[in-house]
Structures are given as structure tokens and as C-alpha cells.
Amino acid sequence: MTDYLHSPLHAEHEKLGATFTPFGPWEMPLKYDNELEEHRAVRNAAGLFDLSHMGEIWVNGPDAAEFLSYCFISNLTTLKEGKAKYSMICAEDGGIIDDLITYRLEETKFLVVPNAGNADTVWDALNERAEGFDVDLKNESRDVAMIAVQGPKALEILVPLVEDTKQQAVMDLPYYAAMTGKVARKYAFICRTGYTGEDGFELIVYNSDAPELWEELLKAGEEYGIKPCGLAARDSLRLEAGMPLYGNELTRDITPVEAGMSRAFAKKEQDFVGAEVLRQRAEEGPQAVITGLVSSQRRAARAGSEVYVGENKVGTVTSGQPSPTLGHPVALALIDTAAGLEPGAAVEVDIRGKRYPFEVSALPFYKRDK
């Protein structure tokens, strides 16, 4: 029997009747009741997510910005205090180790948030690359919890719980920015980020404070129709928003060039791990790119389904399912650039031995009203 890691909110999930699923070394909520209702709650009102399985790594010191710029494909020296940046950490051969978000709290203080399944790998990579840099690394992945409130009502739910002197600052906080403050009397790192395609916030708090904050957010959101949401809804939401998932769209066999992230290092002058390979790959152009597919049929493509134009295989589906918001199947696929497919182009997807018509689509599939 596998001994899974549990979130500090595990007892809260049990009280809410959650169905659990393994996620890397963790056991996390898959859903609470109906994943479609959870999905729709986020699109129409708000959803509450436990993201405590995500990693949290602090990077402090005079060389912190230069160090992270060496480790990641993006230039972190230009990131302003209080802002966040989406980036990737790669191996020497350009393969993606993880995609992650980095926050700059102060001139020499950064927080790196890697994906749950890659947190230990990222921690090891940062330590291996730290030689020669004046930095201090601290892994708090097991010491803190992350709770996300996402959806069009997220701001209305969160603000009344924020300490009076910080409420206006939270209301004015731009997307991909962060600040500190008390939420429900608990010290929190408040980030206006998310993985759903909606407005929302991700709150990092000490493990001991997480259960009370979770309960306070549920209580505050009750009048708005907030629902606790599991990983199933999180996956369908991010797919509609065209956001990649590590292990599906992003792997060690994919480089940021195929993932559409060449712009992150296009003007970067500093050296970074994988730079030589990635700059050459970017100059040559990707052999395949992550592409959106849609269908008017009911049958959804799944990861591993092959994509065809006539008798020629042109790609493989990396993620796919029916879209609860749009009412038809959507998918992401790694498509050969040689096929020359533009939005609107017709393809076929082999689903259990039978081919179904799909169409190439621009991304994202869903975009919220601002």
C-alpha cells in the first residue's frame, strides 16, 4: 500500500465527501460531488481549490535574480518587485523539466512555485546549479498550504476577509502580481494568479492556518454559490483556457520552442541552462507545435489519440475532453509543422479505431470577459 502525502486540508475534504485520487506523491481531491457543477461554478461564480501539493521554494541573496535567470529560460533580472512571471526550467538538452511561476517579493527575494509532481526535481536542479552564486535556497513545500479562489466572484468573496488597511490594495492588484497581508486574520502571501482562465487569487499560508482559512472562504462565498473544486474541474478548466499541463503537453521530450515559449528567451542576453540548444532550435523553427482542436461531434479525443490528414499521421492528442462551457469536445495536440495546418483546417482523430472529424482551432478555446 502506497503512503501518500496529505494536504493540511485533508480532513476538510473528508468532511465535504471528497473523492480522492493520487497525484504524484500526493493524494488530493478529484471531485466533491459533480465535477461538471464544480467547473460551471468557477465559470459563473467561484470555486475553491486546495493546491497544497504545489511546491514553494524561496531564493534569497544578492545573486538571486541572476541565478534564476541562469536556471530558467526567462530573464528574471527585469521582473519588478511584487510581480510574477511564468517560465520554464530546462535540462541541458532543452527538454522541459517543469513550467513554473516565480514571484519577486523584494530586490533579492524570490518565490518559485513548481508543479507538485516536479517540486523535488526542481529543488534538486536549483541546488545543483547554485555553485558560484551568492544565494540561499529554502524549500517550504511541506510547510505551507496554497488555497485558490477562482471565478468572476473571487474578488467579492476575498476582499471582506482581508485586513482593512490592505483591502484597496487587493482590489487594485493586477493580474500576475502579489502582495502580503492578513486574510481571515491569517498571514498570507496573496497572488492574483490562477490556472482556470478566470480571475482569481492563490493564497499561500502556514499549514496550521489553512483549515480555518478554507472554512472562512467557503462561508464568505456561500451567498455567491462558491463550490469546493477538485482536480477534475481544474483540468477541464485549464484545457478550455488552452493552458498546458506538465506530463501531457509539456515533457522532457518537448522544448519551450514546441511549447510556443521562444519569446521568453528571444531577447535574452544572459547565458542559461539549455541556451545553446534552444537558440538553435528556435532559429530552425519547431518540428511540431501545441495546437488546438475542436469538434462538433460528441465523441471526445483523449491523450494518445492520433491525428490524421488523409492517410498521413500529423500529430498526437495530448489532452482532450468535452468542454462543459462550450458544449463540444476540445483537445490539445502536438502537430507537425510540416503539415501546415491553420485554424479552420480539417483533420481526423482516431478514437478507439474509428476516425472522427475535428478542426484546428486558435487558442484559447475559452476566454473570459474582462
Swiss-Prot record:
Catalyzed reaction equations: N(6)-[(R)-S(8)-aminomethyldihydrolipoyl]-L-lysyl-[protein] + (6S)-5,6,7,8-tetrahydrofolate = N(6)-[(R)-dihydrolipoyl]-L-lysyl-[protein] + (6R)-5,10-methylene-5,6,7,8-tetrahydrofolate + NH4(+)
According to its UniProt record, the EC number is 2.1.2.10
- Any GO molecular function: transaminase activity
Which of the seven top EC classes does this enzyme belong to? transferase
GO biological process terms held by the UniProt record: glycine decarboxylation via glycine cleavage system
Q: Which UniProt keywords apply?
A: Aminotransferase, Transferase
Keyword Manganese assigned to the entry: answer is no
Q: Would the keyword Transferase turn up in this protein's UniProt record?
A: yes
Please list which residues make up the signal peptide.
none
Which NCBIfam families does the record match to this protein?
gcvT (TIGR00528), PRK00389.1 (NF001567)
Annotated family: Belongs to the GcvT family.
Please give the subunit comment from the record. The glycine cleavage system is composed of four proteins: P, T, L and H.
Stated role? The glycine cleavage system catalyzes the degradation of glycine.
Which protein are we looking at?
Aminomethyltransferase
Which species does this protein come from?
Answer: Corynebacterium aurimucosum (strain ATCC 700975 / DSM 44827 / CIP 107346 / CN-1) (Corynebacterium nigricans)
